[in-house]
């Protein structure tokens, strides 16, 4: 036996473990959090994949559900003490099914990439052929890009957009599908600003015996709000993130109307790809889905699209070259090649001016992903903040001012313009405050 005296509570538990806030317990992390809150309050967020969640979503995600392991599914867990977890996960499932009018929903994927990976695990085998929209045409890494798992484990065939109007080239899709006979055809993307003809994709999939998957991560909130065509009724399976336009926590989800596919999906998510779900995130998903079922969310979704169109139209009036000429959704893509500016220089200059967007490839982009020839801008976060068409028109002018100055003076000589725009940005943000208690 050990001769050491028994450990006291103070030996194993820091003072104030259950009572001290972050500022006292870890000032370094609290400093980073404080900086992020200040950034969100004072900058205009135009990254199309980002949004601003409600206080209720923040509260759920920061809840005691972070303590709980809940491997399995509601009513069929591998641990005890899971009744509260069953309640919130079933709420998330039921609300997702109601929101998208679908038969089955798995709310456990940790991310959109995990959701896409689970579908591939469920419905394909390594070495199978899959088809997806190429990255430079607006697709996503997980749809078969060479650098991603989907491009390494599968024979990935990539389709693109027409060079004249930058819309999906369905003649190419048909030809590639007939030639390669893919097991899975994927559509959706991260920088495609137009509606997609889901019915035509399904017809092509049926012709070649493929399954059809829609990744609606970017436009799920627009579908939920009734301002974007729904993929349900066409796709065999639908994946999404739960943030972006859906305005929930960062996470993923998989939906289908096919019971046999649903069973395969459930097994692929757990135990195939993940262990226990992140129950604090699942709880936050349930909250966000509940918010999206309210009438105000339909108005929000409509405003997101209207604001994006205003932003794109004003940028075009100011001389910007827009990929596809505009947008049907929440995002627009600006080709900077006509003004001789790179995406990296543009997004860095805009951030110095208080506007966050991201550098982005454009169709047939000659520059690498770390540099790019374009930027992507979006309206979800600004719309959540309360910006309307007048504000987005003003934002477009601020963007154009920075880009014009950059083209004329270069990154080193654009400081005066950036400082002037930053003052305008902060004045606009002060009129539309967020998180007053933080």
Curated annotation (Swiss-Prot):
Its EC number is 2.1.2.1. Residues 361-383 are annotated as: Disordered. (6S)-5,6,7,8-tetrahydrofolate binds at residues 135, 139-141. The modification N6-(pyridoxal phosphate)lysine is found at residue 244. Keywords: Amino-acid biosynthesis, Cytoplasm, One-carbon metabolism, Pyridoxal phosphate, Transferase. It is found in: Cytoplasm. The keyword tRNA-binding does not apply. SUPFAM superfamilies: PLP-dependent transferases (SSF53383). One of its GO terms (cellular component) is cytosol. Homodimer. Belongs to the SHMT family. This is Serine hydroxymethyltransferase. It comes from Rhizorhabdus wittichii (strain DSM 6014 / CCUG 31198 / JCM 15750 / NBRC 105917 / EY 4224 / RW1).
